[in-house]
Amino acid sequence: MIAAKKISTAYLEQEIMTLNPVQLLIKAYDAGITACNRRDESKASAVLVELIDSLNFDYVEIANSLFRLYDYCMREIKRGNFDITLKILKELRETWLQVQDNVQTEALQTSSL
């Protein structure tokens, strides 16, 4: 059982190392969604801390907006209100999936020129 766990961990680490920034963000949202579904305050909070730490304040307006949203989610989780955080994380995940799809579509169009 321990060997299988080590293999699984190694595979996950390798997968994460090959993801682009948008894919990493989507993975973080997936982890937050899972934690909220399980009502796991510790993991949900840890995901939100990672999301906050990943903000790029070179883009002040969007970073500040996301910071306020993540901070709000953190407070709601501390109150035991996982449902609103779950909804927000799902919506943000969907948005970033659309961004990823748009970037891939644009890359394909550019490469076919």
Regions found by a protein language model. Give the residues of each.
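Surface/interface-facing alpha-helical segments and adjacent flexible terminal/loop regions used
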Residues: 1-53, 57-113
